[in-house]
Amino acid sequence: MTASPPATLQDPDDAAAFARRHVRHNVLALGADFGLFLIGLSFSSQTTILPAFAAHLGASNLIIGAIPALMTLGWNLPSLFAAGYTESLAHKLPFVLRYTIWERVPFLVLAAVAFFVAGPIPGLALALMLTMLLLMTGAGGLLMPAWMDIVARAVPLGLRGRFFAVSNLLGSGGGLLGSVLTAWVLARMPAPRGFGVCFLLSALCMGLSYVALMRCASRGPRWWRRRRRSEPICAA
């Protein structure tokens, strides 16, 4: 008898079987990523906290009012230009893991700005704040098609509606608690230090969200190490 040849590294049936074996793990990992991301955003709300911080820095009413619109545009517009490139990627997860850092690090920068720059140089702090918001939302918009593709591959169609419903519910519930904690922090800490604590809480949740995304079961190369020639390819 001759042994049957091994499946090719990019065999779609083999990739689908891998996804089915890890569906529970990936649903939990991606759900935690999404939920924690939403909770992190609640500590730096684009409709309350960020405009209030901009007002503290002396921003004009035009800039304060434009912050939510600019962030919404940043989340959505880049996706139109990134979709074609994302579609050409053989593996989406390493791409997302590599560049989603630029969605998360800006919160640490905002915290540093609030603690060390906002007091002595508010004009510079405002410029840095707007730059970080553009970087964060631009990176998020560019990565959105790839992240949605990962969800589509990892979460079966029959579970997808429940996945987003439960993740949104938990994220919104956590966000409500986050809003309460934010109000408590701002009531007890003078500006801009209170804003800095809020940004640190956002960064903490974003970091935990990143760890959850890293736990997504993958057979492909991770961005932080070189792939061995014999290492199988990621389904996502």
Please report, for each region that a protein language model flagged, where it lies by residue.
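Helix-loop boundary and gating motifs at the non-cytosolic
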Residues: 2-86, 93-111, 165, 171
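A residue-level signal for alpha-helical anchor/packing sites in multi-pass solute transporters
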Residues: 52-53, 150, 212
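C-terminal membrane-cytosol helix-exit motif in multi-pass small-molecule transporters
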Residues: 203-222
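Hydrophobic core of transmembrane alpha-helices in multi-pass small-molecule transporters
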Residues: 35, 100, 106-113, 121-143
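Juxtamembrane helix-start elements in MFS-like secondary transporters
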Residues: 60-68, 125, 129, 195
